Amino acid sequence: MHPIRSVLIVTKPGHPTALDLAQDIGVWLTRRGVSCRILEGPGEALPLRQLAADAGLVLVLGGDGTMLGVARRLAGTGVPLLGINLGRVGFLAEVPAGEWAATLERLLAAPLRVERRLALRFGVERGGVEIFQGDAVNDVVINRGALARVITLDIDVDGERLAGLRADGLIISTPTGATGYAVSARGPLMDPALDAFTVTPICPFLGNFPPLVLGGGSVCSVRIREQGTEVHATIDGQEGIALRSGDRITLTGLRDGLCFATLGGGGYCARLRACGFVRDHACTLPDMLPDEGGTSTDV
């Protein structure tokens, strides 16, 4: 990509530290000939998309939650994002707050490199009419309301019936979201570069539905068969839709829907270790090779 000439900074709303840091970064960028605009909180999708259209980079100051909100509103625009971590986990917002200057210096010194990932695009249909459409960065979760009851769902893939499912819920996740709710439900970890998404049940009745990986171009349709129980769809853990019996949610991959600036540091495995998703238990195995006398070592 071309060198960065303009930056849009989006801060976590109601976070004075983020706003102060944004002002410091804005001054730093201006002194280097980069135009800068600061926005407190992502707000509505349309104004954010309009502001981001003129930016070579969107810098997000906050935690992974703030990154999710901004990335979801900018899904499909192709505008690269970079997160400065002011939160806890920092899997999406990967730049430590104390390293922002060195990081930006590196980004300005060479053409920007980006990593494109799959997002989810979904629609909710009621009575044959689409009542909602949206995108998801991490996942769409279909689950019960306040009462501890299983729900019944009908699942089709590419127009073909897959199964009826009785479970606490269902998680449809992108590779980016595989380290979120899905992994807690024993879904697989996925390389973010994969053109695929997962369908993972939450506590399936009798355990008769293993996690499923679908190609990014597949269409997964979920019909709510439950009556008399509250059912909701939650998008990235941040937005919710109340569902009724007979409603149908249709989901598919949005290729290149997410765009992140890359720093060329540690890879995916390093991030998994750093964030505690895998543990490296070093051990020394006994020598199993035959000794000079032709006998093997007993263990």
Curated annotation (Swiss-Prot):
InterPro entries: ATP-NAD_kinase_N (IPR017438), ATP-NAD_kinase_PpnK-typ_C (IPR017437), NAD/diacylglycerol_kinase_sf (IPR016064), NADK (IPR002504). Keywords: ATP-binding, Cytoplasm, Kinase, NAD, NADP, Nucleotide-binding, Transferase. GO terms for molecular function: ATP binding; metal ion binding; NAD binding; NAD+ kinase activity. The keyword Transferase applies. It catalyses: NAD(+) + ATP = ADP + NADP(+) + H(+). GO terms for biological process: NAD metabolic process; NADP biosynthetic process. GO terms for cellular component: cytoplasm. HAMAP family: NAD_kinase (MF_00361). Belongs to the NAD kinase family. This is NAD kinase.
